[in-house]
Regions:
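Short alpha-helical transmembrane segments in multi-pass integral membrane proteins
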Residues: 1-21, 81-148, 190-245, 303-368, ...
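Transmembrane alpha-helix boundary and packing residues in multipass membrane permease domains
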Residues: 24, 28, 40, 79, ...
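Transmembrane helix-bundle signature of multi-pass secondary active exporters and lipid flippases
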Residues: 25-79, 143-150, 239-306, 326-334, ...
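Juxtamembrane/transmembrane-helix interface segments of polytopic membrane transporters
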Residues: 31, 35, 39, 43, ...
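Helix-loop interface residues and adjacent transmembrane-helix termini in multi-pass membrane transporters
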Residues: 33-36, 44, 50, 84-87, ...
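Short runs within selected transmembrane alpha-helices of multi-pass transporters and secretion channels
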Residues: 74, 143-161, 169-177, 198-211, ...
Length: 461
């Protein structure tokens, strides 16, 4: 890890970001396949594929909540560990990781119990209809059992990335994705298990990835070791991690709340086809967003380490390169979606009527993702430098202050009420990006100035 530390602190930033970001981008693309491969196979189940796809789509809010709880711990814990490494405090970094591991086990047990007891009620609340509840219930009953594997794979995997081992993180995702792609057709079509087979394939794949992550963190190659003596939850170390991770948690968990609002409104105005289209829109949005998030995750160790080491010039250069990279990608993917919406919709279903409906909705829903690279770059930088308040504010404004009310306002302003619901997304995104850019410009300068002053004080003592 001494080589990794030297690399994070001294290597040319362009080459360093490329080295760290490529594996994380690949991992995010693989993760995207991992998340949507079930839907692709399910959408092609003979006879009732469209209803099955809609049913699994209703499960997505719950799955988002499970992932959000992993992010609550890891997205704050991993940057805090990186900052501690930058300060030379490796003991605290290992205690942070151990405490986060214990918290994830506790959260996994609670989530599993809640899902097994109230699964059907939650699915009905999240937009399942009498036509889709059977498929949704079958999927979630099995998926809930594998909650612990999801928590540990996502949560502890972040600590691998935080150390600069982005290739290992990529392998973690690759193992799970390949396993899922192989197991899905076997269970869905070979054993004729349908959506139950898709869920079983997913949790078995997550279990394999989980074993890989834990073996690495307990092994010789990991600089930060997962040790039994560090499993005690030290509030002074772990609670600041939760505060920092709250922004990511709000972003991800709010997706489930937003999904409920979208699904209920779409069911009201457009019926099952509108909800089915929303499942596809969410999948395409993941395709658009995950590579940007991968670039940002590749930048996180560089930003956190150098901020901890009070090397503000490298922090500024890394942010600028991150911003340019995210914006370039967001413009490219926006252009592809605008030009070929039918192609993206056709990946998920052979139903021509659903493809035609989705293609129109897709151009609306993804209308301003061309500038969303600004949002991703600013938010990841807030998290990477430990600015919990601003990262939380940005998350709350976009989801709760803007998008949530707009889901109900826009249908009243547009003649086609179904398309009005979809329009809420681009309107909210445009306002949110503007707000984030202004807030970041002010707060980033303050953070760098404060770090520079602290560095001068230390050098004069």
């Amino acid at each position: 890890m001494s080589d990794h530390k030297e690399m994070l602190g001294t290597a040319p930033i362009g080459k360093l970001l490329f080295t760290l970001a490529v594996p994380t981008v690949v991992a995010q693309l693989i993760n995207m396949l991992y998340n949507i491969v079930d839907r692709i196979y399910i959408g092609h189940i003979p006879g009732n594929g469209s209803l099955a796809l809609t049913g699994v789509g209703v499960c997505m809010p719950i799955i988002m909540i499970i992932s959000a709880f992993a992010a609550l711990i890891a997205s704050g814990g991993a940057p805090k560990a990186s900052i501690s490494i930058g300060k030379g405090d490796n003991d605290s970094a290992e205690k942070i990781m151990g405490g986060c591991f214990s918290l994830q086990l506790i959260i996994s047990a609670i989530l599993t119990a809640v899902l097994l007891i109230w699964n059907k009620d939650l699915l009905l609340m999240f937009g399942a209809s009498e036509n889709t509840i059977g498929f949704a219930n079958d999927y979630m009953n099995i998926y809930a059992i594998g909650t612990v594997f999801v928590q540990l794979t996502l949560g502890m995997g972040a600590f691998i990335t935080a150390q600069g081992y982005t290739k290992t993180s990529m392998i973690t995702v690759l193992i799970g994705a390949v396993s899922n792609i192989i197991l899905d057709p076997i269970f869905i079509f070979g054993f004729k298990m349908g959506v139950k087979g898709a869920a079983l394939a997913t949790i078995l794949s997550q279990a394999i990835s989980c074993v890989w992550v834990l073996l690495f963190l307990c092994g010789k190659k990991s600089y930060l070791k997962l040790k039994k003596q560090n499993f005690r939850i030290d509030g002074k170390l772990v609670f600041p991690c939760i505060a920092l991770g709250a922004a990511t948690f709000i972003m991800q968990s709010s997706e489930s709340v937003i999904s409920v609002c979208f699904n209920s409104s779409l069911l009201k105005y457009g019926g099952d086809i509108a909800v089915g289209a929303m499942t596809i829109l969410t999948s395409v949005m993941q395709f658009a967003m995950l590579p940007m998030q991968g670039i940002a995750q590749g930048a996180q160790p560089i930003l956190s380490y150098n901020f901890g080491a009070k090397n503000t010039e490298r922090v500024k250069k890394t942010y600028k390169l991150l911003l340019v990279s995210c914006l370039t990608y967001s413009f490219i993917i926006w252009g592809a979606i605008m030009l070929f919406p039918q192609m993206f919709a056709g990946i998920f279903t052979p139903d021509t009527s659903l493809i035609a409906f989705t293609a129109t909705a897709l151009r609306i829903y993804c209308g301003v993702i061309c500038i969303f690279g600004i949002q991703i770059a600013c938010q990841m930088t807030f998290v990477s430098i430990g600015n919990a308040p601003c990262s939380i504010i940005v998350a709350i404004v976009r989801k709760f202050v803007l998008l949530l009310p707009l889901i109900y306002i826009m249908p009243q302003l547009i003649a086609d009420k179904t398309m009005g619901v979809y329009t809420a997304e681009p309107v909210a995104d445009l306002i949110a990006v503007t707000f984030t850019a202004i807030l970041f410009t002010v707060q980033f300068k303050k953070a760098l100035k404060s770090s520079t002053i602290e560095n001068l004080k230390e050098t004069t003592q």
